[in-house]
Regions:
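Extended, low-polarity segments enriched in aliphatic/aromatic residues
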Residues: 1-56, 60-295
Length: 295
């Protein structure tokens, strides 16, 4: 059974504390995968919260360009958005597909034959997958699995996942026909490909999800709606499925009235299917022990 650490406190000290609770040393050049947030979005993780941990790990913020236009579709505009959102104030930022991409295999994929990732991912010795937990218009919710699949894919790779393996074209991908469950499964397959790639190269990954600004919309939405429920805290694990499962369990066990809106967003998009499918393909376990570090 996987261990998931939990704190209700969301501040820079508790973020460092929960990372240390994992008992893992991220060696060498550390990539810290966050969502840099679309211009206009408000939920992305802010400097005040994450800068001390990023500095402690001497980490580089890593991200890839998007596949839907907007303020992060090309590197030059993406860099402007990153600067506007304050990431350059405390870290180096690497738009990993700015100089190209490469394919990594999806083993026994039902939908994807490969995952197309930002070329510079190869430069990192370890990774902290630092997700902002929230809803998502297409995936139902975004946590560590989405951050590792869509997030590490190049813009063409994102198109390939969004089209369930039909095209790498960033225009054509949006008119591809598929069942919703197939898209959810494609995200899990891409995340597993990244896990496999890191494991084969003996590069560890740690997973943290900050459950604040709980909007039904993702940080990739320039018109991100207001939070629908109160902040829940932070979860951390070495297992991305367990960590996302814990996030969903906290959302679905909430008795807050507004939580129903996020629950509805998740379930109308078959969002929790990514957990059972992720477990099925060996990405992680839905069974976990929750360790409350506040006690």
């Amino acid at each position: 059974m996987s261990k998931v650490y939990f704190t209700r406190n969301i501040n820079s000290e508790s973020l460092i504390k929960i990372y240390k609770a994992l008992g893992i040393e991220l060696p060498g050049k550390v990539g810290i995968k966050v969502s840099t947030g679309e211009d206009g979005a408000r939920g992305y993780l802010k400097q005040q919260l994450i800068a001390p941990l990023v500095k402690e790990l001497n980490g580089t913020i890593i991200e890839c360009n998007t596949a839907y236009g907007g303020s992060r579709a090309v590197t030059s505009k993406h860099i402007e958005t990153v600067r506007k959102h304050g990431f350059y104030n405390y870290a180096e930022v690497d738009i990993m597909d700015s100089e190209g991409e490469f394919k990594i295999p999806v083993k026994n994929g039902k939908h994807l034959k490969y995952d197309l990732v930002g070329k510079n991912i190869a430069n990192y010795d370890s990774m902290l997958n630092l997700a902002h937990g929230k809803g998502h218009a297409m995936g139902g919710f975004g946590g560590n699995i989405k951050n590792q699949s869509i997030g590490i894919a190049s813009s063409k790779g994102k198109a390939y996942i969004h089209s369930v393996g039909q095209t790498e074209d960033v225009i054509k991908c949006w008119s591809a026909k598929y069942q919703q469950e197939e898209f959810i499964e494609s995200m899990a397959e891409a995340a597993k490909a990244v896990s496999d790639y890191f494991e084969e190269h003996k590069k560890p990954i740690a997973y943290i999800t900050v459950m604040n600004f709980l909007s039904v919309d993702c940080d990739c939405d320039a018109n991100q709606s207001d939070p629908v429920m109160n902040d829940l805290g932070i979860v951390a694990s070495l297992d991305p499925v367990a960590n996302d499962q814990a996030f969903m369990d906290l959302v679905f066990s909430s008795r807050e009235e507004g939580a129903k809106k996020l629950q509805e967003r998740v379930d109308t998009r078959c969002g929790r299917h990514i957990l059972e499918y992720g477990e099925q393909i060996g990405l992680g376990s839905t069974k976990y022990e929750l360790i409350d570090i506040d006690k």
